[in-house]
Structures are given as structure tokens and as C-alpha cells.
Amino acid sequence: MKFNRTAIARLLSLSFNRSLWLAVFVLPLVAIPPLRAADDTMSQPISAAKDSQLHYLKSGKPAASEILPPPPLPNSAEQSADMDEVRTVYHAASSNDMAAAFGEKKFSVFNFAGAVGGYFVATNLPKTAAFFEKVQLDAETVTDLGKDYFHRPRPFTTDPSLANGKLEKSFSYPSGHSTESMVLALVLAELLPEKHDAIIAHARQIGWHRVQIARHYPTDIYAGRVLAQAIVKQFKKSDAFENDFDAVKAELAAAQK
């Protein structure tokens, strides 16, 4: 799978202040080292305790702390703009948006059935189910360590008026839903290139729903998309991933006959 600047721009493009996006995601990559890098307990992105949980990734690769810029600083103009966008999106969300977002609290690759087709269910595709479970668990591990590294409070923590439903205790940046859904989508879209646009669109929707219920800032969502590309790129270096990918491709082809 090839990743280029054009592809990244397509994934990141949503109606959001471009100046904020440039300041948060582009300039810090050149000018600002990762936060907390001097903290030895946090500088190992995937610890020995996490190694046994990895399926297609090697320890420390990819590291969110090395790929992503820091999130906006507390009390900064960037943070204020990010929070304003959360409030705007949250208050504009419909009841259907809210229901969809809460319905995706737990999700798997089979949430993409609407984009793929009626045959795309776990009971029909055991190899596909097992493969994507590993893919998602690896993505979750990388993302969770990124959250613990950057320590960004969630929007509803900073502004309690945004609190609704059962609230997560984890940190905000990068978004796990955005990262995991885009990882699933990028891999699935390579398996089913004819469904590429619909698959990617659904992943973007899963991520954006998290802003609509004030679980994440827009910059959390964009960071997840960047991290997802890095994770999938690293997957492609794994022989185990490539072997399982080929087996899943054959299973999907057979299921469509």
C-alpha cells in the first residue's frame, strides 16, 4: 500500500479552520519535539508488558509520540478554537447523529457491512473476523499508548457542560475511534478496492461522530487518521500480516461468488 501527501490530505480534509490545522499538525512536526520525551517511563511507546498483545507490529513501531505533533496547549488560542468547534458540532448534532455515535462505542470491521455488502458478516467470514480482530487490537495498543503519552483531557473534562452519557476515563489525543476505524478501513479498502470510497467515508463518519458527542476534539480525529496510515504502513512490513491478508482476500472473493 502506498501513502503520499495527496492521500493524507484527502483523509484529513474536513470543514475545519485550515490555519488551526496547519499550526497544530504541520508546523510542530518541524519545530517542536514530542512532549514528555525526557520522561523515561513514557518514552518507550510500546512497553515489554504490551509486547505479548501485538500481532503484526514490532515493539515501539509505530510510536504516536514520534509521529504526531503535540495537541494544542491548554489555554492557547489553538485550544480555544478546537473547543469552539466541539461546542458548535455538539450543539448542531441531531438525535440520529447522537444515536449513531453511541451505537458505535464498540465496533468492529463488520460495522462496514453497509459499505461492503450483505454477505459481510462474521459468521460467514471466520478468517476475516480473526484477521481484523488482530488488526484492531494492534491499532488500539498503539493509540492507547499515545493517549497516555500526550495526556490531553477530553472536551467534557475541560467543559463539564458537554458531559453526556457514560463518560470515558481515558485521555483524548489521538482518538481511538478515529485511529482504529481508519486502520480497518485502509486495510479493508485494499482488499476491496471497488468499495474504497464508501469504506473510507464510513471510517471518517465513525471518527467525526466522536466530536458530535463531545468525546473528542477535531484535532484528535485528524491525529487518528495520520496515525492510522503509519500503523498500516508498518503492518505491510510483517510477513504474518501479508500471509493473513492473502488468506482473507481469498475468503472474501469466495464469499462474493
Predicted regions mapped to residue ranges:
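N-terminal secretory signal peptides that target proteins for export/translocation
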Residues: 1-17
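Catalytic tyrosine of NAD(P)H-dependent dehydrogenase/reductases that use a Tyr as the general acid/base
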Residues: 14, 173, 216
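Bacterial N-terminal signal peptides
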Residues: 21-31
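Sec/Tat signal peptide C-region and signal peptidase I cleavage site
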Residues: 32-37
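Hydrophobic alpha-helical bundle signature of multipass membrane enzymes
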Residues: 39-213, 244
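Short alpha-helical linear motifs
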Residues: 153-159, 184-185, 221-229, 249-252
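Interfacial helix-loop-helix junctions of multi-pass membrane proteins
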Residues: 205-236
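C-terminal membrane module of polytopic membrane proteins
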Residues: 232-257
